[in-house]
């Protein structure tokens, strides 16, 4: 495995705002660096909500970025998250493996568990060199992009290479819900999980 080596020079944009909720956070990698399903890891993940994406940094027109999005009114549930879940988007292109935390869908023991009614923070770290649009069925993700109570609600959030971002989730929908990369060949190769709200 290798460190992706992505630094601010590759990121584009002016960097994270001073009140970024993940500023100074240590990224968590297991002792096996997420196993064979991860060809590389991000040792220094970056704030990229202000990055328009590959090929658009020098566009002569304005490009909408996640840092621009704002809800029209506050979501009623403004509780602080009760807990955090850190999830790594992992891949090994040489072995055509895509996964969460180094484990393909067919290799996990059980679902990701949300407690019904809880508010939690989902932290996603992209340890690959590709964008991953991550879709949670059944519930909204409230992207933490600096707008506080006006966090935008999203069902799908694209996580850029080397990026770490977070979203708050109100686990208000009991049952089993699919959680996956929306690039279907990544999903079929294993970048998918089930969320169980109970």
Residue map of PLM features:
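Copper-binding active sites and cupredoxin-like electron-transfer domains
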Residues: 1-198
């Amino acid at each position: 495995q290798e460190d992706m080596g992505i630094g601010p020079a590759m990121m584009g944009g002016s960097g994270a705002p001073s009140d970024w909720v993940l500023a100074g956070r240590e990224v968590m990698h297991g002792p096996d660096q997420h196993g064979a399903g991860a060809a590389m890891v991000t040792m220094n993940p970056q704030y990229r909500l202000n990055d328009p994406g590959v090929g658009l940094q020098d566009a002569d027109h304005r490009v909408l970025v996640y840092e621009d999005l704002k809800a029209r009114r506050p979501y009623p549930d403004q509780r602080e998250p009760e807990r955090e879940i850190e999830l790594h988007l992992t891949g090994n292109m040489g072995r055509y493996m895509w996964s969460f935390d180094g484990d393909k869908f067919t290799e996990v023991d059980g679902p990701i568990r949300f407690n019904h009614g809880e508010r939690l923070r989902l932290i996603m770290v992209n340890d690959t060199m590709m964008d991953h649009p991550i879709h949670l069925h059944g519930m909204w993700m409230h992207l933490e992009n600096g707008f506080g109570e006006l966090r935008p609600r999203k069902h799908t959030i694209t996580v850029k290479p080397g990026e770490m971002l977070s979203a708050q989730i109100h686990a208000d929908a009991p049952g089993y819900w699919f959680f996956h990369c929306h690039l279907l060949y990544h999903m079929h190769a294993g970048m998918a999980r089930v969320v169980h709200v109970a």
